[in-house]
Every structure is written in C-alpha cells, then in structure tokens.
C-alpha cells in the first residue's frame, strides 16, 4: 500500500524566535523543501523593510484595513507588537488543513500561544534559541533596521521568552544554520508520522488482521 495516496491530518507548526536569530531563513527553507507545507503569511500594519515584498513576506495593510479584518473575524490570531498590528488570516489556514496539508507559522511568542490554545494537539511549538544575547545584539546592530531603543526592547523581550522555554515542544539552538535546519526538518517529519495524523493506518491494520496466515 502506497501511503502517499492516503490522507494525512494536517498540523500547525509554529516556529518562534527573537529577532536576529535566523527564524525567517530557517522557515523559508523548510517550506521550499516540503511541498505539503504552506507558510501562513501574516497581515501587518508596519512598513515593509528593504527586500520585503507584499504577499510573499507579509500582507502589508493599512490600520483601517486591519481593523476591518478584525471586525470580520478574519484572523486566527492577532497581536500588537512594538506599535504595529500583526495577524494570521484564517481562510488560507483552514483551506490547507481541510486538504490534509500542514501550515508553518513564522510567528511571535504571544501569537503562538494563542494559536496553541485554540488548536491544542493539532499544533506543534518550536523555539529557536540564539547562541547568546551578545550574538543576537550583534546581528540586530548589523542589519541596521532598528533604533537602539528598539534593539534594547527586543533583547529584553528575548530574555522573557527564553525564560518560558518549557512551554515549547521542541527547542533548537541556532549556533550552526545547517544543523539547526536539519533539526527543524526532523521535527516536521516526525510530527507528520505520528499515528494520530495518519488516520488511514487504522483501515490498513484492519485489513491486515483479516488476512489468513
């Protein structure tokens, strides 16, 4: 029996990390390497950063548009971060799950906790640790996107998140990108193989037990 022809139960894979730890590079590569994994593209009211594109990195919307989406209950979760709003549009996520496909969230801590509270066993929480706060600070200064005040807030928030590491199913140290990516890919593969996400196995077992020896 070819298991590729049998339905899976999709999962919500949430990857959380402080800014400057490499989360975006890890998640984009995972989606690129796995055709059955879809990236949840968040809507945000913040301005695009250099190199970001609407519809690929984020859906960049006005505050009025975001408020309208809130009124329509269009988000699975939403949050205000550093004065800007972020939200995960519900419709594409539900569509992917209905096809038995999985959805990857490149998401912040509070957003991940909200989704996990709603999705329960259908969600998997992964936290990416920096090798040190000093290295994280160096990366944030190197990319020259934030003021000193914002960088300080990001570092303080990172310490608060790291203190909550036990709330996550998996924790990955990103001191080597290729190794961290391999760990993330292994987590995704293992979660997809779980019995609860492969309902077709029950029918296969029933057929096997009916066979004469």
Curated annotation (Swiss-Prot):
Its main location: cytoplasm. Residues 10-189 form the Guanylate kinase-like domain. Pfam families: Guanylate_kin. It catalyses: GMP + ATP = GDP + ADP. ATP binds at residues 17-24. Keywords: ATP-binding, Cytoplasm, Kinase, Nucleotide-binding, Transferase. Its EC number is 2.7.4.8. Belongs to the guanylate kinase family. This is Guanylate kinase. It comes from Caulobacter vibrioides (strain ATCC 19089 / CIP 103742 / CB 15).
């Amino acid at each position: 029996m070819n298991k590729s022809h049998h339905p899976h139960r999709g999962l919500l894979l949430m990857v959380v990390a402080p800014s400057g730890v490499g989360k975006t590079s890890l998640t984009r590569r995972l989606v690129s390497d796995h055709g059955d994994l879809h990236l949840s593209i968040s809507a945000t009211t913040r301005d695009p950063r250099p190199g970001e594109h609407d519809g690929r990195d984020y859906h960049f919307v006005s505050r009025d548009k975001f408020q309208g989406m809130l009124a329509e209950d269009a988000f699975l979760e939403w949050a205000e971060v550093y004065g800007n709003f972020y939200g995960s549009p519900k419709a594409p996520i539900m569509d992917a799950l209905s096809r038995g496909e999985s959805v990857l969230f490149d998401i912040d801590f509070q957003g991940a906790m909200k989704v996990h509270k709603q999705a329960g066993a259908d969600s998997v929480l992964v936290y990416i640790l920096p090798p040190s706060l000093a290295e994280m600070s160096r990366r944030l200064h190197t990319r020259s996107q934030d003021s000193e005040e914002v960088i300080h807030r990001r570092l303080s928030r990172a310490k608060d998140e790291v203190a909550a590491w036990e709330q996550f199913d998996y924790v990955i140290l990103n001191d080597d990108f290729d190794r961290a990516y391999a760990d993330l890919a292994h987590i995704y593969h293992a979660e997809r193989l779980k019995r609860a996400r492969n309902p077709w196995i029950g029918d296969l077992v029933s057929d096997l037990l009916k066979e004469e020896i």
